[in-house]
Amino acid sequence: MIYFDNAASTAVHPEVVKEMIPYFDTQYGNPSSIHQFGRKAKNAIEKARKQVAALIGAEPNEILFTSGGTESNNTILYGIPKSQGPKFVLNHIITSSIEHDAILEPCRDLEKNGVKVTYLAVDEHGHVNPDDIINSINPQTVIVSIMFANNEVGTIQPIKEISEICKKYQIPLHTDAVQAVGKVPINV
């Protein structure tokens, strides 16, 4: 059998397994502890944080580790609107109609609780028109969430242009870049 869905899930590279085995076997200390095992674990995490930061053009202190893409997406999509307190139901989110379910499901759930969500249409190539983002922004818009790369159709969104729009309007931009990291250059 040949597996063609490595963008969604893939085997761990043998070199990575080799590097990780000590942390599953002999160096399993709590990184928050001050003992030797804890310090070694903390050093390994900080090394990984620096490597991830370098990969995406970030600072190490900007990197937060989660269990995966879905948890990261949920943290942002639920966190930003709910950070507004009881007024969170007045919030507005802009996303695209072709997002991964890890984005669409939280948006649908937030809609059930009163949050307004605009689902932008895409063109025949799967691209979001940045002008549609501008036209959808309103005073209640708290976040724009557009995937960087679509793993089903291969579309790369104009994230740089979308980022500039979000900066201009002072609206946080969230991009699920799981499908893009390691395949196209990323500089946050």
Can you name each region flagged by the protein language model?
Residues 1-188:
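Pyridoxal 5′-phosphate
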